[in-house]
Amino acid sequence: MLSRYIRLCGTASDAVKLETLSLGERYSMGCFSNKKRVVIIAGETSGDLHGAKLVKAMQKRNKGLFFCGIGGQALRETGVDILIDAREISVVGITEVFSKVPNILRSLRMVKKTFKTMRPDLLILIDFPDFNLHVAATAKKMGIPVLYYISPQIWAWRPGRVKKIEKLVDHMAVILPFEEDFYRKQKIPVTFVGHPLLENSLPTAQRIEDKWKDDVPAIGLLPGSRHGEIERHLPIMIDAARILLKRIQTIKFIISLSPDVEEKHVKEIVRKHKGEADFEIAAGNVRKVLEGSKVVMAASGTVTLESAISGTPMVIIYKVSPVSFRLGKAMIRVKNIGLVNLIAGKEIVPELIQEEASSTRIADTVFKMLSDPSGLKQLSLELLALRDKLGGPGASERVADIAFRMLEK
């Protein structure tokens, strides 16, 4: 952090003093008034990771940029000045949002104050639509250009939000192939940039082949990246694991721990529910879990797509509060909720949602998949084929192209 302030303001003695000052105070002192200023907002773990890749791509081309905004560990590590930690405002479900309302309102005020203080040259929004569209409205009033990277799933539910996007967003950078046509039909400027997950090192066909040679099956548990998701999903997954252990005594279990989740919290849930089963916890390394598992139990979200491009079969599960589920169900316009199935255009992996996501049902589904090795291997190949629909590597570079064009206007 100190070295970054030295780069911004020139001397070590100045930098030591500046670390104690607010963003507004530093701006008023001219620390980065000669730099292009970019505000980036990512309210979820996946957005934080993708945002960090974008920031790195932009920094590689131009060191004379100043970034600040809302995010998590990944964005912070790139040098983004984090005004608010994303965990303070991240939430899943409709009724679940009420507990975060004070934090959300405080964060909106902070963003508005930041806009007035330093007048950014560009606002980059990453998914997280209910919060980000409020921010976009403020930016629009102030004449700040808005780039929206990773579209809200308005093609799936609450399609009326497209009218807001049309009014508030200057350019959409979308990561799913069918989203480009959706926005073009609405005459909204859009570019399909491909999926940023393809920028990660991908397992080779040989590595996937080796996984099937292991006689001892390992099952991955991917309960989500938010506190509420883990509270709802992990106990059910652990109970399902205990049922599976009674049927397959040699089975192993690995829990994927998101970088933004405290390990002690997960360990406490495991302690309460594990019974005779043993669980390895893989902190911050979902790739290790995917590459080591023949099947994963995965909370619906980005990680299901990551499972697909690694060729790992999965059971998608999801639970929210009963009220959130009823309200959400009334607004959903698609048959499947899993990204894997949406991109495939059919259900290629099972989805167990709400009441269907019981420990018994999950265990039965996983056991059935493990009992058909040839079918499981064929499913792995189907999942790998989805890579071809995701645009190839280079998403961050393509979004950076758009960002720099907008900065130059």
Model features per residue range: what roles?
Residues 2-9, 16-18, 22-409:
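Nucleotide-activated sugar donor-binding and catalytic core shared by glycosyltransferases
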